[in-house]
Amino acid sequence: MRKHPQTATKHLFVSGGVASSLGKGLTASSLGQLLTVRGLHVTMQKLDPYLNVDPGTMNPFQHGEVFVTEDGAETDLDVGHYERFLDRNLPGSANVTTGQVYSTVIAKERRGEYLGDTVQVIPHITDEIKRRILAMAQPDADGNRPDVVITEIGGTVGDIESQPFLEAARQVRHYLGREDVFFLHVSLVPYLAPSGELKTKPTQHSVAALRSIGITPDALILRCDRDVPEALKNKIALMCDVDIDGVISTPDAPSIYDIPKVLHREELDAFVVRRLNLPFRDVDWTEWDDLVRRVHEPHETVRIALVGKYVELSDAYLSVAEALRAGGFKHRAKVEICWVASDGCETTSGAAAALGDVHGVLIPGGFGIRGIEGKIGAIAYARARGLPVLGLCLGLQCIVIEAARSVGLTNANSAEFDPDTPDPVIATMPDQEEIVAGEADLGGTMRLGSYPAVLEPDSVVAQAYQTTQVSERHRHRYEVNNAYRDKIAESGLRFSGTSPDGHLVEFVEYPPDRHPFVVGTQAHPELKSRPTRPHPLFVAFVGAAIDYKAGELLPVEIPEIPEHTPNGSSHRDGVGQPLPEPASRG
């Protein structure tokens, strides 16, 4: 017996056609945000058609960033969009890959759970996909059952890899009933400049391919660089057999935070609510309108250098970039991100050329030796000149290495980059040694997920957080070597936050009388930032960059540092302005 449609959890599937990178994830996130502000409890899920179990071991140039959830899952970057737009933490089950599905099915076959059946894509693979989709409708940790589950199906209709997921979605509709399932298809409407025409044929073919596997979309998102005229929307509705109210024009928006308003203007949320018989309230735009005003009407602009090794693909640092921008929103400031390849900062002259006109330096996470000396060089340059610095994960480790070299440990390094270094100020975590030695799987074995930390009460980070008890998400195998803490402290660097047992260094900083703002964290705070609730560390960092730009913290004139020479302690002094209270801004 099926549940009554007013009490059942509704499922909304988002597919894509014609081309990839049309913005399915942002469309799904924006619709989720719209339904949330209408008073509905929404959760989201991404189905990825690749055979990797998760993106944790994938090349950032191919996949982009790895988004880590509170429970320690390494997931697709779209899950980050979901969390930021819904303003809700999602579980690891919000990302399903073909690799996970096949691994589970094969493990069941080996255990004999299929009782001798011939294991096939249909029904065994599709049944496992359905199980994972339907599991998202279970109550969350607080006992709240979602009103709507939005599931984004990765890939493009017609891809071989996506077929099992589309078939599973079709079967979910058959199982739950048409009144409880909604299909939203995102398609490209290209503009041909020579003829001055918008072309609907690609969308017609894409919908035909979808219908050939048994799925008729309830609504179409038409992606274009301009508004699709009403006449063309009527034509598409007729040829694709879709209600005219379900044909949605979504021209390119100036900001991703404008997309919910675009969908609302086209009344997509109202159409979904009517079609699924959902309870609702009117949209309260107060908070989102304030965000959009901050996005489009900044009072000032600051330039932040993001010094990384994957800067050719900005998606590799997607959450970092969004957290920086959100930190700017708090101050009504626009953050211009300068993408700086770390290789170019190994020398003082290279660092000066890359960082000479920025107001802050951010060192993001990463792996491998390439570009490390450039990150350390960028920190040395910034520290000598009073530039604010924020280091994330590997960024903290680079701050520690630079500090160690400045007090005489000239060969200080990380065991990751130089296993034979005489001064491994960054060491392999004890439970990771077997993995680093190649004796265990790399995937899913790092220190992952949310862990607590205790901050020193009078520290810069405690001032930023406005508390001494924090919890952040992590993804690392290496830690500060406690045997070197006392020596490193001679540089002035302070270990201002640790794990509750005091063993693992979680935060480092220079006191305000040594440098206006140099903060490093072993965590990935960018993963918890929201556009309407920016992360306190990013708020404080952008605030320090604004002060630097305003001339409140003047650069220190120092003699030229010889090339390839570690930064000395004499280059640290001369700046003594305390960090302004971040809460007083914005």
From Swiss-Prot:
Keywords: ATP-binding, Glutamine amidotransferase, Ligase, Magnesium, Metal-binding, Nucleotide-binding, Pyrimidine biosynthesis
Regulation: Allosterically activated by GTP, when glutamine is the substrate; GTP has no effect on the reaction when ammonia is the substrate. The allosteric effector GTP functions by stabilizing the protein conformation that binds the tetrahedral intermediate(s) formed during glutamine hydrolysis. Inhibited by the product CTP, via allosteric rather than competitive inhibition.
Region of interest (Disordered), ranges: 560-586
InterPro entries: Class_I_gatase-like, CTP_synthase, CTP_synthase_N, GATASE, GATase1_CTP_Synthase, P-loop_NTPase
Keyword Repressor belongs to the record: no
Binding locations of UTP: S20, K199, T200, K201, P202, T203, Q204, K235
Binding locations of Mg(2+): D78, E152
Entry's Gene Ontology BP terms: 'de novo' CTP biosynthetic process; pyrimidine nucleobase biosynthetic process
Protein residues bound to L-glutamine: G366, L394, G395, L396, Q397, E416, R477
Annotated metabolic or biological route of this protein: Pyrimidine metabolism; CTP biosynthesis via de novo pathway; CTP from UDP: step 2/2
Sequence positions that bind ATP: S21, L22, G23, K24, G25, L26, D78
Other comment: CTPSs have evolved a hybrid strategy for distinguishing between UTP and CTP. The overlapping regions of the product feedback inhibitory and substrate sites recognize a common feature in both compounds, the triphosphate moiety. To differentiate isosteric substrate and product pyrimidine rings, an additional pocket far from the expected kinase/ligase catalytic site, specifically recognizes the cytosine and ribose portions of the product inhibitor.
Known role: Catalyzes the ATP-dependent amination of UTP to CTP with either L-glutamine or ammonia as the source of nitrogen. Regulates intracellular CTP levels through interactions with the four ribonucleotide triphosphates.
Family, per entry: Belongs to the CTP synthase family.
Protein name per its UniProtKB record: CTP synthase
Organism: Mycobacterium tuberculosis (strain CDC 1551 / Oshkosh)
